[in-house]
Amino acid sequence: MMDALEKYVDSLSTPESELLRALDHETHMQTIQPRMLSGHIQGKLLEMFVRMLRPRSILEIGTFTGYSALSMAAGLGEGATLDTIEVDDELEELAQRFFDRSPCGGKIRLHIGSALDIAPTLG
């Protein structure tokens, strides 16, 4: 049932970008828990929420490989930023590489470490 529903929703959604498709593929190839990836439908939902709410800043705790951060950044307006915190330093290179390739990547600031330590330092 869920596969049919997911296929239906996917058929009505905007197609996944080449960049996000490549990130999905690399996440599945390079991580031991690729199911943690937000994915296309969840990413589009996050982007829609951001477009509707028009925040000036977003704090994401748990970057993983950056799919949700890229999705939310796509919905951010001019001058808005997204700070994303990831505790696993082994994921930094993969996430940052895709942030650097994205036209929205300049809106994203990746922080590596404990959210308990980093969040209070963010303005």
Predicted segments with their positions:
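Residue-level preference for alpha-helix termini and adjacent loops
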Residues: 7, 35-36, 63-66
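A short glycine/serine-rich beta->alpha loop
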Residues: 31-36, 57-58
